[in-house]
Amino acid sequence: MAVDDYEELLKYYELHETVGTGGFAKVKLASHLITGEKVAIKIMDKESLGDDLPRVKTEIDAMKNLSHQHVCRLYHVIETPKKIFMVLEYCPGGELFDYIIAKDRLTEEEARVFFRQIVSAVAYIHSQGYAHRDLKPENLLIDEDQNLKLIDFGLCAKPKGGLDYHLMTCCGSPAYAAPELIQGKAYIGSEADIWSMGVLMYALMCGYLPFDDDNVMVLYKKIMRGKYEIPKWLSPGSVLLLSQMMQVDPKKRITVKHLLNHPWLMHGYSCPVEWQSKYPLGYIDEDCVTELSVFYKYSRTSTTRLISEWSYDHITASYLLLHSKKSHGKAVRLKHPLAVGDQAVTSFKELRPKSKLDFEEPNGEIAYVFGSMDFSDEELFSEDFTYSSFEPHTPKEYVKGRLEFNSVDSAPATPVVQRNARHKNEDKENSNTAVARDENVFLHPAPWTPTPRRKQNEKKGILTTPNKNTQTKEKNQSKETPTKKPIGTGEEFANVISPERRCRSVELDLNQAHIDSAQKKKGAKVFGSLERGLDKMITMLTPSKRKGYTREGPRKLRAHYNVTTTNIVNPEQLLNQIVRVLPSKNVDYVQKGYTLKCKTQSDFGKVTMQFELEVCQLSKSEVVGIRRQRLKGDAWVYKRLVEDILSSCKV
């Protein structure tokens, strides 16, 4: 880790453990120093990105202009010569995919709750002129209140002529791709999203995909036929809705507008799906402004002006995280400057809107498009809308791989599948969303002021659903357990925290790069020295000690849907069984305590899957469990593999 690359980031955040990895990025859990709020930081290496750099630009531009209760919030963007950091809303519930496989499948009632939120998010982004183009359970996260947040806008499109403008680039995940995409035809982005939503809803209620095959070309043929299996547990209403979304002819597909108050989505509800944003960026909360101005000793007028520039720097992040605290019923308070060092305070006044990120800009000046769909001016549900139906049938299987290939003006009838087909200057489908800071671009409806609410812990209970004969697996919920040190609470931050302790979590002593020790009080220096010596002593004596571990056994965790319970009472016995099984499944692993860091590789040595299996003790019981976390690789392949491993362990 180069000091220069992380110097700016460490002024404002304390890094914790890695919670996800990808082809060119990793995601770390972190704490915002002055609010104490948890965030997720997506760390991307520019050199590794290569020709995918425009995709990052697309994602950042989209997230800067999307603010919705079911869209993951962007807080802060930091660029260095080698790195790009995206500071995002942290969703401790993990991926919706993991939730599905842990429960085998969802009941119709639970699927309806989630699907209404998905429709809300998609209707909103369509109203802002965007098509997502990569809708799938892995791109929906669950927050602390069991609400969904849509993520990963790297493949989204904002057509220059609005959503009725035809697109040509075929992208996304093969199993969720609409027939017109894989045929290489020009398509409407919003129509393709509807098909993906149908596949997603099917996965919610069935626990597997409607179209799947290990051979991608066979998979395409199944998709183009549009025939899939109808399990006996699906109700007539859900079967009808699935058929309306997964119509091979995009013109016969139901629209988002008609989904908003579709009978299936309205069942048990008195109002249509609310798609409008409750958090328009044009609204600035006075309580948050007051706290920021007092904390930084800056005038309210100047503070308001800096916030309203929406530069997605530390000012934006501090305001949005403070506002998030308020909306969750927490005190609108920032931590004392001594607890976070003077750098954050002095930097606030010095921060000004910076130049755009160093991305290649599209040619020409394109008008910025807002609200290409106006749902409120028309009847939400047309009486003359005719629902077409058919009898789909396809056996259950699993998917693998991700589709992303680009076509130019004339697309071939049979597309050539490529893993990373990139064109350096290609972003022809998106309008120029780079926003000049002196322009009034945030034209929003009247703001909705969130009323403070307490965390609704009762909503976190997992509904019971009939399960198959194998216990299913899923990704990390243990994101709340830092690898290097526990995440500080508000009370912990009230004390003076030396920069040495704060930087320990990123494995290097980076504090000298960004802490001016001359600004520290003498007492702070003394305590910092004592703490530094104490840290060294603890590290020498217990180099692998982690929060929750004891010499006697594994960590104690709360029962969660990413923890599989077992009938084995001896944790060492369970760990040994897993270790014996892994080689037979061609899984390499490294053992650290009761955690097994696993990976699979292709014949050419490329890592295709990374995940963790941890033997743990469930709190308030003597039951031993296995925590599962997918870090990298295809979700459905991961599902099969971990099911196979645990089945062989006979747990």
From Swiss-Prot:
One of its GO terms (biological process) is cell population proliferation. The gene is melk. The keyword Chloroplast does not apply. It is an enzyme of class 2 (transferase). This is Maternal embryonic leucine zipper kinase. Keywords: Apoptosis, ATP-binding, Cell cycle, Cell membrane, Kinase, Lipid-binding, Membrane, Nucleotide-binding, Phosphoprotein, Serine/threonine-protein kinase, Transferase. GO terms for molecular function: ATP binding; calcium ion binding; lipid binding; non-membrane spanning protein tyrosine kinase activity; protein serine kinase activity; protein serine/threonine kinase activity. It comes from Xenopus laevis (African clawed frog). The KA1 domain mediates binding to phospholipids and targeting to membranes. Activated by autophosphorylation of the T-loop at Thr-169 and Ser-173: in contrast to other members of the SNF1 subfamily, phosphorylation at Thr-169 is not mediated by STK11/LKB1 but via autophosphorylation instead. Its EC number is 2.7.11.1.
